[in-house]
UniProtKB/Swiss-Prot annotation:
Residues where Zn(2+) 2 binds: 166
Cofactor(s) recorded in Swiss-Prot or TrEMBL: Zn(2+)
GO biological process: proteolysis
Species: Neosartorya fischeri (strain ATCC 1020 / DSM 3700 / CBS 544.65 / FGSC A1164 / JCM 1740 / NRRL 181 / WB 181) (Aspergillus fischerianus)
Protein name per its UniProtKB record: Probable carboxypeptidase NFIA_052450
Stored InterPro entries: ArgE/DapE_CS, Bact_exopeptidase_dim_dom, Peptidase_M20, Peptidase_M20_dimer, Peptidase_M20A, Peptidase_M20C
Amino acid sequence: MKPLSSLLLSAALSAAAPPHPASPQAPLADIPRIGVETRTEFSQNSLDDVVNASPLLSFHRDLVSIESISGNEGAAGAFVADFLESHNFTVIKQPVTTESDARFNIFAFPKSQSHSLDESHPSHGPQILLTSHIDTVPPFIPYSLHRDANDTDDRNILIAGRGTVDAKGSVAAQIFAALDTLAVQPPAPLGLLFVVGEETGGDGMKAFSQSTHLNPSPSRFHTVIFGEPTELALVAGHKGMLGFEVAAHGHAAHSGYPWLGESAISAILPALARVDHLGNIPVEEGGLPASDKYGRTTVNIGQMEGGVAANVVPSEARAGVAVRLAAGTHDEAREIVLKAVRDATGGDDRVVVNFSLEGYGPQDLDTDVAGFNVTTVNYGTDVPNLQLHPRPDGKVKRYLYGPGTIHVAHGDNEALTVAQLEEAVRGYKKLIQAALDRSTS
C-alpha cells in the first residue's frame, strides 16, 4: 500500500465537535490547510454528499463522531448495538465493570442463528469471529473530511479524526463485510465482537475470554479475524510485551550535606543505564533475545520521576519501562531484567523492579489466504487477550488485518482514505470466504 500523502496527513481543517463529554483537540494553527485558494469546487457539502451516499462511510462517520476514550465507551457501544439490531443481528451486551453497565462488549450474530447459541452445543454457534475495539486513546479529535484541490477522485478523500484508523475503521469495515457476506450466504456462521478497553490493558477482551457462555469449551470459533491498522496487509505476527517499573528508595537531606542522605536518583541510574541497552546486548551477555522474524527486542524508558527540588537529596525515584519482545517468553524476559538490575546495582536492595502487567510473548498469526501483502508489526493488540479453548479438530486460525497505518493511529493527524476503508471491506470478505471454504472442505 502506498503511504498517505504527507500533505494530506498534516491537514486539520476546523470542524464542529459533537456534544460528547471529552473536550476535543483543536486543530493546530500552523498546520497548512488543503487547497484553500482553489477549493471552491470541492465544498464541504460536496464532501458530505460523498459520505451520505455510502452506508459504509456514513456509519464510519457517525461512529467516529462519538467520543469513546477508554473508560467512556458507552455511547459508542449503544450506537453499534442499535445499528446491528436494526440489521437483523441478535446483540448481547456483556458488562465489563461491576460498578455500572455503562461499559460493555458487544457480541452479535444473525438473528436467524439465534437458536444455535447453546453452551451445550458450542459447535452450532458462530464459528467465524470478526473482532475489534471501540475505545480510543485521548484526546478526542472531531471527524473531518479533506481533499486536495487538484484531485477529483472521491476515493482519495481523507477522513480524519480520533479513531478513524484505530480502530473504528476496522469496526466499520468488518460490519459491512459481514452484511455483504450474509446477503448472499445467509447461513454463514458469523459472529461480531467489539470490545472496550483495548488501549488500556484489554479488560474488555479478557472479560469475554472469561465468559463460559460467550466463550465455551470447546471453542465454537475455528477462525478469528482481528481488526487493527495494518495498511491492508495480513500480519504474520507481532512482538510481545512486558511492562515494569524500576523504583529506588533513599533518604532526603539538604543538598549542601548530601552525605547525610541517600540519593534515590543516584541509586537508580546504573539500573536504568543497563536496562536501556538490554535489547542491544547479546543473550549470552545477559541481554534480551532477538529473532529473524521480529528483529531486535526494543526497550523504551518512557517515564521518569524523582525528587522534589534541586537542592534536596531525592528520597524516591522511579521509571516506567515498556519492552517489545522479539523472542522468548515474558517470564524469561522478567528474569533477564531482574538479573540486569541486580548486576548493575551490585545487589542494592534500595532498587526494586515491579512488574505491572502480566505480559506476553510474540504472537504468531496466520497468513495462508492468498492475495494479501504480508508483514509483521511492533505494536500490541488484543490477540493475546482472547483466550479460546481448544477445539477437537485442531487449532484456531487467527488473522490480523485492517485499514490505515499505525504510524498515525495515536497522533493528531490520524486519518485514512475512502479507498482504504472500502478496500478493507473487500479484504475482510476475502478472509471470511476463505474461512467458509475451509469449514466446508
